[in-house]
Amino acid sequence: MAQAVDASKNLPSDPRNREVVFPAGRDPQWGNLETPVNASPLVKWFINNLPAYRPGLTPFRRGLEVGMAHGYFLFGPFAKLGPLRDAANANLAGLLGAIGLVVLFTLALSLYANSNPPTALASVTVPNPPDAFQSKEGWNNFASAFLIGGIGGAVVAYFLTSNLALIQGLVG
């Protein structure tokens, strides 16, 4: 086995000797690397379809979508894994915990918006960053929509979890 590895070092046609990591755009001054993962069409498609990078969305719509997702998935760990998981009102505790964390995230976003953040740079994965995050107003719109969406997502998760028996009875 060691012989095969040693012998492959001298064969340029061996796939193990091909470079797969390059500087982005073949320019080492960018300070970014183009790998088979971040340069693949599937990863580029996925990243560019996330709400933060999808073209044509306003900052408010971006914040609403991101907030709904965060509020929805933050509810579960607070309700089902928190210290009140065995209590009768575990779902309410999960709702309040998720809303509290969304409020803290919104405060952090507002602080970041008021710190004059740098403009987004083009990268291998996102060659055209959106204009939504170029101004303080865009970031503040994103933060306020994040709060609304986050609370809404947590309330939807609370409603679905609290009324699971009713929903199962309606569906089947």
Swiss-Prot record:
HAMAP family per UniProt: PSI_PsaL
GO cellular component: photosystem I reaction center; plasma membrane-derived thylakoid membrane
TM helices/strands, residue ranges: 92-112, 142-162
Record-linked Pfam families: PsaL
Top-level taxon of the source organism: Bacteria
Post-translational modification remark: Two stable N-terminal degradation products have been sequenced at the protein level.
Designated name of the protein: Photosystem I reaction center subunit XI
Family named by the database record: Belongs to the PsaL family.
Source organism phylogeny: Bacteria, Bacillati, Cyanobacteriota, Cyanophyceae, Nostocales
UniProtKB keywords: Membrane, Photosynthesis, Photosystem I, Thylakoid, Transmembrane, Transmembrane helix
GO biological process, one term: photosynthesis
InterPro entries: PSI_PsaL, PSI_PsaL_sf, PSI_suXI
